[in-house]
Amino acid sequence: MSDIEEVVEEYEEEEQEEAAVEEEEDWREDEDEQEEAAEEDAEAEAETEETRAEEDEEEEEAKEAEDGPMEESKPKPRSFMPNLVPPKIPDGERVDFDDIHRKRMEKDLNELQALIEAHFENRKKEEEELVSLKDRIERRRAERAEQQRIRNEREKERQNRLAEERARREEEENRRKAEDEARKKKALSNMMHFGGYIQKQAQTERKSGKRQTEREKKKKILAERRKVLAIDHLNEDQLREKAKELWQSIYNLEAEKFDLQEKFKQQKYEINVLRNRINDNQKVSKTRGKAKVTGRWK
């Protein structure tokens, strides 16, 4: 609530208090006037009653003078209408209008004071609620700003991570392409020099006078196929990729081994079947030959 509204409210309250005081003063003046009018009416009625009583007495005296001694012998009639005299209020039982007015003013003042206190209490509560609402709004705004900052930082980290991942993949792709190119060039150079290598091997075997056994050939082939594992210069992501690559190569080798074993089993089974057929055919041919010879000699 602004200062202007507070000043306006205070001015309105002062005007209401002044109007209440003026109404009370007017009400007091009206009561005084009514009391004065009531007193004047009572005095006028008393005076009229006194004048009437005096007139009645004078008329009775005149009648007595006219009637003479006849009326003196007659008994004097009693008047059935007594003289009406306004009752006078004793001093101890008089109504104190000032006291009534004072009590009423005190009551109105207390009610007004209670209304003013209730108004200020409500106003204080509203101000406290407004302050708490502002604090709540500021706290919520700060929390929202903090959440937005954290969200922006996470998004920035995610973008940086994606950029690093993209750069790493590009680097791996380039390195793989370079290795493939080098491997192809090496294979071509080996193919070009393969004939000379075979001749040299034959010459060395002829000179040595002995041939390599199958075990030695296997060891030599494995030594040529086995590659040196250089992982000292690789980071965590590259090591993870290298592990995946090795796992894939092992998986492929195991699959190839399984296929070769199944193929070997199939070939072994076929050899056994063919061998059994050959044995059966040889047995049948021997029995047929013996029967023919015996029949011929008979």
Swiss-Prot record:
Keywords: Acetylation, Cardiomyopathy, Disease variant, Muscle protein, Phosphoprotein. The keyword Cell membrane does not apply. The modification Phosphoserine is found at S2, S208. Residues 1-95, 120-219 are annotated as: Disordered. One of its GO terms (biological process) is ventricular cardiac muscle tissue morphogenesis. Residues 120-183, 203-219 have a biased composition (Basic and acidic residues). It is linked to Cardiomyopathy, familial hypertrophic, 2: A hereditary heart disorder characterized by ventricular hypertrophy, which is usually asymmetric and often involves the interventricular septum. The symptoms include dyspnea, syncope, collapse, palpitations, and chest pain. They can be readily provoked by exercise. The disorder has inter- and intrafamilial variability ranging from benign to malignant forms with high risk of cardiac failure and sudden cardiac death. Cardiomyopathy, dilated, 1D: A disorder characterized by ventricular dilation and impaired systolic function, resulting in congestive heart failure and arrhythmia. Patients are at risk of premature death. This is Troponin T, cardiac muscle. It comes from Homo sapiens.
